[in-house]
């Protein structure tokens, strides 16, 4: 008899909603039309797999503005400023 706990129908991956395909026209409406910095793995799946090469990044030296607001940079504690006279006290 089948174990109901390990059944494929009880898994999260079976019951979750599929990720919708990315519509590039919606990105243009938001002002994020610079999609050349990403390579599309498979157009039928619509997954982004990585950033552009170094030659493409030289063309755009300011980089992607959204990378500044990643979850790591946004939620980390600010670096404490230590002055030279405080270092002398240590």
Swiss-Prot record:
Subcellular location as annotated: Nucleus; Cytoplasm; Cytoplasm, Cytoskeleton, Microtubule organizing center, Centrosome
GO biological process, one term: extrinsic apoptotic signaling pathway
Pfam families in UniProt: WRNPLPNID (PF15017)
Keyword Nucleus assigned: yes
Modified residues (Phosphoserine): 84
InterPro entries named among the record's database cross-references: MLLT11_fam, WRNPLPNID
Motif Nuclear export signal per record, residues: 24-32
This protein's record includes keyword Ubl conjugation: yes
A Gene Ontology cellular-component term: centrosome
Main localization (coarse): nucleus
PTM text: Ubiquitinated, leading to degradation.
Keyword entries, A-Z: Cytoplasm, Cytoskeleton, Nucleus, Phosphoprotein, Ubl conjugation
Assembly and oligomerization: Interacts with HSPA8 and LAMP2 isoform A; the interaction may target MLLT11 for degradation via chaperone-mediated autophagy. Interacts with TCF7.
Function (record text): Cofactor for the transcription factor TCF7. Involved in regulation of lymphoid development by driving multipotent hematopoietic progenitor cells towards a T-cell fate.
Family: Belongs to the MLLT11 family.
Protein name listed in UniProt: Protein AF1q
Organism: Pongo abelii (Sumatran orangutan)
């Amino acid at each position: 008899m089948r174990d109901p706990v390990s059944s494929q129908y009880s898994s999260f991956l079976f019951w979750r909603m599929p990720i919708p395909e990315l519509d590039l026209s919606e990105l243009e409406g938001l002002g994020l039309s610079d999609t050349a910095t990403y390579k599309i793995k498979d157009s039928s799946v619509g997954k982004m797999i990585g950033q552009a090469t170094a030659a493409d990044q030289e063309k755009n030296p300011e980089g992607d503005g959204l990378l500044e607001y990643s979850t790591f940079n946004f939620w980390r504690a600010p670096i404490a400023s230590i002055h030279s006279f405080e270092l002398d006290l240590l």
